[in-house]
Amino acid sequence: MARLGLGPAWRCTFSNDICDRKAASYRAYFGDAELRVEDVARLKPKDLPGNPTLVWGSFPCQDLSLAGNGAGLDGDRSGTFNPFWKLMRGVIRLGRIPQIVVLENVVGALTSHDGRDFTAIVDALVQEGYRVGALVMDAVRFLPHSRPRLFIVAVHQEIAVPSQLVCPDMSEPWHTTSLRTAYGRLPEPLKDAWIWWRLPIPNDPIPSLASLIEEEPTGVEWHTKEQTDHIISLMSPLHLEKLKKAQLLQKRVVGTVYRRVRPNEDGVKVQRAEIRFDQISGCLRTPVGGSSRQTVVVVEGRRIRSRLLSPREAARLMGAPEEYPLPIKYNDAYHLFGDGLVVPVVGWLSANLLTPLAIARRVMIAA
């Protein structure tokens, strides 16, 4: 999905994923000329073609996310950064230096192991001659989807970075408190190699959640009354009150529900259905258990309907085009988008930072 966001200005020469199901969707849309389905740890520098301007790495978030096990870069999944960077070091040793490196992950990467994982990533980049900066970009600025993600953008020291791409100091909204804290933990030599990237703030209209919801969805069915009643029975008084207020509006209101484990008034952990009507979807997650799949609730006065979020709705919340092919199986589709990148977020980063950096490189060479 990074390729979708980068757009036609960038030509993809190599793509890698370990998941056959994701690869099938990629092939259906892009073809498979540059796709290699393989564990990144088994790739060799000779497998990567040419002299890349940009290398993009999105490594699994499970060991870094708030819902993960806290293993950080030592975990089996998020630990794929290490073989990825070993591969990049091999490419660099061959004199094929990527001019720009982008690493994407959950914001938990900033605090994992008290910030030591983030420091290790920055140090790895700086040791290979890169200047490094980072941004926290939330999909909610582009789509009705709360999905903050960390983007580490590194540029090789050979590139003269245009001044308009740099902030003199940290600034909102891209440089959040957690990012500033992580930066503050860096040793001085790494701070010396740091760049506070500048990005404009998007001001295009954001579609409402209701506008993305299908009345006749494909891949899911509306719940029975008993199933909907069960979801309502899991709501706390606070969330029941939200539901009641939506009913009093006497019009079609769309909300979403995630199930979460919360302590009750006696301190006992129980499952709760938490509903929101702010026209923002909760962050899509990979479908590990029923509670990780988001439920759509449509309220029309006394009538309340519910069902799982459909595959096409998940694709829309990630900004994928309508013609993007969906996996046949529900969980495969939900996994594809729950583990993916939000297309307009990548597009904004590409148009306002990555492409200008690439142009600066070409201008420098021409000069």
Which stretches of residues belong to each language-model region?
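Active-site catalytic microenvironments for nucleophilic, acid-base chemistry
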Residues: 8, 90, 352-356
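C-terminal target-recognition/interaction regions appended to catalytic cores
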Residues: 212-367
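Short acidic, glycine/proline-rich loop/turn micro-motifs
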Residues: 6, 66-70, 296-299, 330
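Short loop/turn segments at strand-loop or loop-helix junctions that form parts
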Residues: 58-60
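SAM cofactor-binding core of SAM-dependent methyltransferases
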Residues: 1-42
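N-terminal Rossmann-like NAD(P) cofactor-binding module of classical short-chain dehydrogenase/reductase
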Residues: 54-56
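Class I S-adenosyl-L-methionine
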Residues: 45-52, 62, 66-276
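Active-site beta-strand/loop signature of hydrolases that rely on acidic residues for catalysis
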Residues: 17, 39, 99-105, 338
